[in-house]
């Protein structure tokens, strides 16, 4: 399955929020030596992960840009210029119910979004990791080639 249409579908779900909040979106479509990047995945769950990550980026970004790009051939990045995640919270962000100091100030935070993303990514064979700096934003990395499929 081509990744570009899946990513565009997920981005479109938030287009009005980007416009209403005057946030910039930078999207660089994926490509490989054949022109388009493809992967075997479950469309519904892959889009769920992308949409959850975009929702988080929008929730914690007051101004600036959310960027979606490939930092390496098979590593998708969703980067924001938001408030960032405190260093002491980073090791626990994928724990069920953990909201960290940002989540405690946001009444809508459940501590389930990143937990579900991690579980779904594991089932899809996708690695997920996060880097963040307070006041500088967050970058989520999805390693799409972490578990190569073997022909049987």
Regions found by a protein language model. Name each.
Residues 57-58:
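Short helix-loop "hinge" at the ATP-lid/N-box region of the Bergerat-fold HATPase_c
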